[in-house]
Amino acid sequence: MNASTSAPPASDSTWSACSDDAVVPAEVRDAVDTVLGPSGLSRPEREILTTRIERWYPDLIDGLVTLYGDPAATRAAAEVLTEAAAAYVERDPELRHLDLARTLDPTWIQDPSRIGYAGYTERFAGDLRGVEKRIPYLRELGVSYLHLMPLLTPRPGDSDGGYAVADYRSVRPDLGDMDDLAHLTGELRKQNMSLVIDLVLNHVAAEHEWARRARAGEQRYRDYFFIYPDRAEPDEYEK
């Protein structure tokens, strides 16, 4: 194993002494360490993630065992947490700090003084840059929770109000782009405002990559969907 993918030495482990196989299996710890070891993150930064994994691993594995049984559940946990660790490494330090603050105060969202504002981007301000220009107005209203209705790229034409999403990784072109969205969230955070967007994940547009590949016959993607020989049963659901 080369240095770029090796786990940190045991002496530099950020797992707690009690994190034996009864809590987080060695297979999972090793998978996470393979990502964190060469990441360049400080020990405290790595320790924050491993502590969170130790805290929530029982909840994760319970759900995975229900779906896959053992030992497949442990392999799935290792895969999921490897991806989570990679995302954590790439995450903006400002957002990692926000994650920690919210972990320490899990009831933050239930604060009765929190004021929410929901609306459609195009009707409220034209586009995402327009929303950014209206932050002072939102601040004047006391808003701390801004919910922008569907703004991800939908299917062309009838898109169920924007909820038939063709691409979860891009913004509707008439509203801006992902850089505009990232900049808006940063400006909102400076005013202690949280941005919320809708992610409906139980269906996608027929134009979504997964749906296209399923129709093309790729079994992996066909397994993501309920597929019927004709419209008879789906039409019953829509009555």
Model-derived features: where do they sit?
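Acidic/aromatic-lined carbohydrate-recognition and catalytic surfaces
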Residues: 2-239
